[in-house]
Amino acid sequence: MNIIQSGINVKNASITIIIARFNEFINKNLLSGAIDTLTRIGQIDKEKILTIYVPGTYEIPIVASYIANTNKYDAIIAIGTIIKGSTDHFKHIANDAYSNLSRISTKYFIPITMGILTTENIQQSIERSGTKMGNKGSEAALAALEMINIMKKLKKINN
């Protein structure tokens, strides 16, 4: 039986973080958590991290698609916050963002990890951006590091 598992130390990787400016007071904490995890735990040089700001979470997939198509990056981390309002707008934005990012990831064989919060209220978002519930940006970075290693191992098997 063959098993592929991987760690999170990735020294020579290039990563793009795409962050929404909408709800930036929350997203900046997610970004900070992601960068700290990539540099401190993953041992990635800051020069190897490209951070791109977009207006909102809905705009993340088009930039992710462009970046994935360049084939210059090992992973993409999507960061945004979608807070439920009084209409269904929340559901549409979240569903479209997640669906499109998943499709891009499988089309280009690039890990895209989700640091996108979908919460009922601002308090839940704050809690998930570095207080009671951890930092989902950091968790997305950890997933990206592990997936980079897994994808490298898969490529070695197929070459």
UniProtKB/Swiss-Prot annotation:
Entry keyword annotation includes Transferase: yes
Entry's Gene Ontology molecular function annotations: 6,7-dimethyl-8-ribityllumazine synthase activity
Chemical reaction(s) catalysed: (2S)-2-hydroxy-3-oxobutyl phosphate + 5-amino-6-(D-ribitylamino)uracil = 6,7-dimethyl-8-(1-D-ribityl)lumazine + phosphate + 2 H2O + H(+)
GO terms for cellular component: cytosol; riboflavin synthase complex
Function: Catalyzes the formation of 6,7-dimethyl-8-ribityllumazine by condensation of 5-amino-6-(D-ribitylamino)uracil with 3,4-dihydroxy-2-butanone 4-phosphate. This is the penultimate step in the biosynthesis of riboflavin.
Quaternary structure note: Forms an icosahedral capsid composed of 60 subunits, arranged as a dodecamer of pentamers.
Family to which this protein belongs: Belongs to the DMRL synthase family.
Designated name of the protein: 6,7-dimethyl-8-ribityllumazine synthase
Protein's organism: Buchnera aphidicola subsp. Schizaphis graminum (strain Sg)
Lineage: Bacteria, Pseudomonadati, Pseudomonadota, Gammaproteobacteria, Enterobacterales
Gene that encodes it: ribH
